[in-house]
Amino acid sequence: GEFKNNHILIGPDVWRYNEPNPEFTEDAHLFKSWRVKAAQEGLRIKVGRWNVAGNPVAILVDFTSFIPQKDQILTSFWEKFQVDSLTGQWDYIEPVLFGYTAGKVIESFVRYHISPRQRIIAQFHEWMTGSGMLYLKNALPQVGCVFTTHATVLGRSIAGNGLPLYDPMKDYNPVETAHRFGVDSKQSLESKAAEWAD
């Protein structure tokens, strides 16, 4: 529709070893020269379109090549943004690596395709992509970053455990509550993403 190829969606390439993703059609001609540059930068991506109304441009990101660097990546988020990843298990680390890699993909695309006068907004949904937003805030601060959460980590944890959510909200200490429910790292990333968003 209205945005044509200026609205680009990014998702994880979860079908990379199986049959083709039925929701995605790769397009070898779309951003062809940038894809070559991205590959030279160590980014493994597929570019094409989602098979939904409007067929928006989509980039699928294979983040697995960054798994060996996870400790350095998590350390950098602590040093730059004080994101506490110490208690994060694989259900935390995997989304952090996806978000980080998505941020690197956006950085590569912007540096290759976008003039300094063009305005770019990158929107990140949920804590699972917050690392991408934080990466961009450091690497390309000129990109406007929006962070959207549809339900917070703590809100889900509180409600999911049958506790009252809205009336006693002021009584919940975020750090203590996150620790109580074992979501310290997720809550830390989410709160830092919200803090650093534009």
Model-assigned labels for residue ranges:
Residues 1-198:
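Catalytic cores of nucleotide-sugar-dependent glycosyltransferases that transfer UDP/GDP/TDP-activated
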